Amino acid sequence: MHLYDEGFEPPKACAEWCRARPFELQVLDDGVTVDLQWWNNHLDDAGHEIRLRGRNLDGRIVGTGTAVVQRNDLRLGSDLIDADHEGLGLLFLCAAWRSAHPRRKAVRRFPDVRDVRTPKGRHPLAKIKGVLDYCAKTKGLPDTSRQTWSGWPDTPGVGVPLMATYLWAVEARTDTGPAQMLDQYGVSTLVHEGWLEDPSVADFTVRRYHRYVELLNTWAGLMSTRPELVEMWLVDRWHARVVEARDGSQATPRLF
């Protein structure tokens, strides 16, 4: 464990919240409403052979309009993905889920994953597909520490939070534990609670991400819960602070 993290224990409210919630219901069933038309139109315009789907209120799979995508759908072989490349289809489903989440710090943005510096004769999607395939096959990140300043592989159009979501979806592991989602709201809560680290997730290096994952797993172990629940509490906690600051006395009461 990082020297600065020794003795940094989870807040009591975090422990109470996590212990009171089942992983399957709270995490895996975490659903959002995705505008399939928007995403599929952008996929068509970009020339991708990918179609995203969702479920209607009856639970049936649909491919048009708005539909629900649950966190449990973020996996290879998902029924909600029809794609010529499984990893790339999953990446776009992760992007759609993240951007539609009402409590996470994300905006709807279509990732341009083409490599604009592609050498002649090489497909512009070869780089991103190669990284995604490697992560899915090996359950880890390629070692690019000598090629990029951050340690992250070169993934055109894909930021750290989206990459972390993909790593969680393919059940990847890091040097410090299972990969976890990374959200600005969650890190803001950690810093507010006393974590001594740079608060910007966009600037997270791989080493900093490993430290973050280790902290979540350590807290989960102390509370006999799952790190995904810890991450969710951190995100929801900051979202609750934002709502309270915005709405004041009109804010919905929360267990914090």
Regions flagged by a language model, labelled:
Residues 1-59, 171-256:
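C-terminal accessory module of base-excision DNA glycosylases/AP lyases that mediates lesion recognition
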Residues 20-83, 95-96, 103, 107, ...:
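A structured, charge-rich N-terminal accessory region that forms the first stable segment of a protein
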Residues 76-84, 149-153, 172, 176, ...:
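Short, charged/polar micro-motifs that form catalytic or ligand-binding hotspots
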Residues 79-86, 91-155:
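Helix-hairpin-helix/helix-loop-helix acidic hairpins
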Residues 91-95, 166, 230-234:
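Short alpha-helical scaffolding segments that buttress acidic/His motifs in well-ordered protein cores
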Residues 97-104, 169-172, 192:
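Amphipathic alpha-helical interaction surfaces
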Residues 163-169:
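Short hydrophobic alpha-helical segments that form membrane-spanning helices or hydrophobic packing faces
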